[in-house]
Amino acid sequence: MSTKKKPLTQEQLEDARRLKAIYEKKKNELGLSQESVADKMGMGQSGVGALFNGINALNAYNAALLAKILKVSVEEFSPSIAREIYEMYEAVSMQPSLRSEYEYPVFSHVQAGMFSPELRTFTKGDAERWVSTTKKASDSAFWLEVEGNSMTAPTGSKPSFPDGMLILVDPEQAVEPGDFCIARLGGDEFTFKKLIRDSGQVFLQPLNPQYPMIPCNESCSVVGKVIASQWPEETFG
């Protein structure tokens, strides 16, 4: 049993008329044919002809594709579909971001040591400021600013953590050889290095070869794992 196709409205027919007129005007300039338009749209040539001739109605998807191919705005041939696309955009833009952002406090290196799991005498109210990231970490995580160039890798090598870069430290994540970490070397001396194991011994390795490796012995304790890095916003003015 066949069903009779619903005829296009006057508005849809006007859209098709305007679309075809634009195509006829621009096809030579853009080097287009119905066949090439069909290829770009991923449909048959007869389907394109049906859109141009008002046999099949345009929809938002096809209108957007044709606007891109003809290098015009959708509104130039279909004001109603242009409104529809705009309303769809508005609805999407009002939705919460798919990538959540999390804020963590920025501490000084001294505060970072006091924030280690066994001490933790500083509170987040002592933060110098708060910085957001899409990286999810524990509630104990905090930012530190890299000091010096011991973690600046040679040119062309990655990763590299130049002076002034922010690193996100999570005291609740386990640190394994190969991880970057903040370690306490005794007293209030802290260092940012890569933890490595060599010949059964654990070392703190700088990325800058001009600096020596540091043995991680009984006076060395890990404060937290470095899980992310980024430049402060003020770096870019």
Curated annotation (Swiss-Prot):
One of its GO terms (molecular function) is core promoter sequence-specific DNA binding. Signal peptide: none annotated. Transmembrane segments: none annotated. Gene3D superfamilies: lambda repressor-like DNA-binding domains (1.10.260.40), Umud Fragment, subunit A (2.10.109.10). Residues 19-77 form the HTH cro/C1-type domain. Residues 30-49 bind DNA. Coiled coil: none annotated. GO terms for biological process: latency-replication decision; maintenance of viral latency; negative regulation of transcription by competitive promoter binding; positive regulation of viral transcription. Keywords: DNA-binding, Latency-replication decision, Repressor, Transcription, Transcription regulation, Viral latency, Viral latency initiation and maintenance. PANTHER family: LEXA REPRESSOR, LEXA REPRESSOR-RELATED. Acts as a transcriptional repressor that allows virus to establish and maintain latency. Prevents both the viral DNA replication and the exit programs. Clamps the two operator OL (operator left made of OL1, OL2 and OL3 sites) and OR (operator right made of OR1, OR2 and OR3 sites) together by binding to them and arranging the intervening DNA in a loop. This step allows repression of lytic pR and pL promoters by binding to OL1, OL2, OR1 and OR2 simultaneously. Homooctamer. The DNA loop is maintained by octamers of repressor cI. Bacterial cells harboring a lysogenic lambda phage are immune to further infection by lambda. The cI repressor protein inhibits the lytic development of any additional infecting phage particles. The region of the genome that codes for the cI repressor protein is known as the immunity region. This is Repressor protein cI. It comes from Escherichia phage lambda.
